Amino acid sequence: MTLENLIKKMKRDKMAVGLLIELKPTQDNGEDMAHKVIDIIEQYQFSRQSIFMSLDYDSVQVIKKEKPQWWVGYCIYGSVGDIDDSIWEMDIDFLAMEENRASTAFIQKAVRHMIPIYIWTVDNTKKMKQYLDMGVCGLITNYPHLGKLTVEEYEKTHFQYYYYDGKGYPKTTLITGG
């Protein structure tokens, strides 16, 4: 299914869920891909329901430059021990990282730098609660209903303390898709 077809379906079915759109460029097509995504999102007026991320920093920077109000993130792959401190200077709204790479120390460092962390792909309640306890701001899951219930229960007894400066839009704690 194409992005365009998915958005049409979501609008038609009045689906009250946001999209995390991951750009996966190949062979230097990142800029072109980013512009095409921008065009589709604008054509269907879907920016308020969308956030964007990529392993390719240049691709998300195209979106950030063209649409600074849109929420964009950088996807970390690999060991957090291999990440240098320049990551905290990136022009991004959040970081997404693979669940088996997350550590309390890294998440707390992100909190100190006021960078929300989203963890993928978390598909069981115990792990969801564990990552929320560690201080993550969002969960990326293949089971949105389970994720939503877990987050709602968690928020009843825990203060949501991560920084949100009002720029961009989502105060997102759950993202669907894996």
Name each model-derived stretch.
Residues G73-G178:
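C-terminal active-site rim and adjoining tail of enzyme catalytic domains
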